[in-house]
Regions:
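Glycine-rich, phosphate-binding/catalytic loops in enzymes
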Residues: 40, 99-102, 146-147
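C-terminal beta-strand of the catalytic ATP-binding
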Residues: 89, 170-172
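Short aromatic-enriched loop/helix-cap "lid" or pocket-rim segments at secondary-structure transitions
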Residues: 80, 95-97, 141
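Conserved Class I SAM-dependent methyltransferase catalytic core
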Residues: 110-169
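Soluble or luminal CAZymes and related metallo-dependent hydrolases
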Residues: 7, 49, 106, 110, ...
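Mobile active-site "lid"/loop adjacent to the S-adenosyl-L-methionine
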Residues: 87-113
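Conserved SAM/SAH cofactor-binding pocket of Class I
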Residues: 4-76, 82-85, 91-92
Length: 172
């Protein structure tokens, strides 16, 4: 389970300004973002591939719903006003793989996988918020966004001593 850190708190603060009916968090882990979403959305759903993260989340949840699945693969015939993800975004280390932080060889593979599973889950005016790091291949992510005709807007940036985090908003 990924424990909340600077990135989670950064995203939670941004998420707090969004409102709607249905919200989804892909890769909910400890539930920090999901709990923030539950303050401004009527129904919130979190997905995670790690059963133990979800078990921990359920012990602390109020009205959030969680599903153990890969990205948004188990969700059908439902559209969300907001989809949020703080995906694993660090380049993978061949000698030590940690699925809670490793985003693949270019550090964008997991982000792209999450986004691919989310695209058909948005309402017409729905939005996707995703956290990205300058440590990942942002050009590869930009190509994916362009290929899928998504509109990208940078919402916020946070400079840390070891990386720069950005939250981007995607719309169709």
């Amino acid at each position: 389970m990924y424990l909340p850190s600077d990135d989670s708190i950064f995203l939670a603060n941004i998420v707090s300004s969004y409102h709607g009916i249905l919200a989804l968090e892909i890769g909910t882990s400890s539930g920090t973002i999901l709990r923030e979403l539950s303050k401004n959305f009527r129904v919130v759903v979190g997905t995670d591939i790690d059963f133990y993260s979800l078990k921990h989340m359920l012990m602390m949840s109020r009205n959030e719903r969680v599903i153990c699945c890969d990205a948004a693969s188990a969700l059908h015939n439902v559209k969300f006003d907001l989809i949020v993800s703080n995906p694993p975004y660090l380049p993978s280390n061949i000698n030590h793989i940690d699925k809670s932080v490793d985003g693949g060889p270019t550090a964008t593979e997991v982000s792209i996988h999450f986004l691919t599973s989310a695209l058909d889950k948005l309402t017409g005016d729905g939005k996707i918020l995703v956290l990205v790091s300058n440590l990942s291949d942002t050009c590869k992510l930009d190509r994916f966004i362009a290929k899928n005709n998504l509109v990208m807007r940078k919402i916020a940036q946070k400079d840390l001593f070891y990386e720069t985090l950005q939250i981007i908003e995607l719309t169709t």
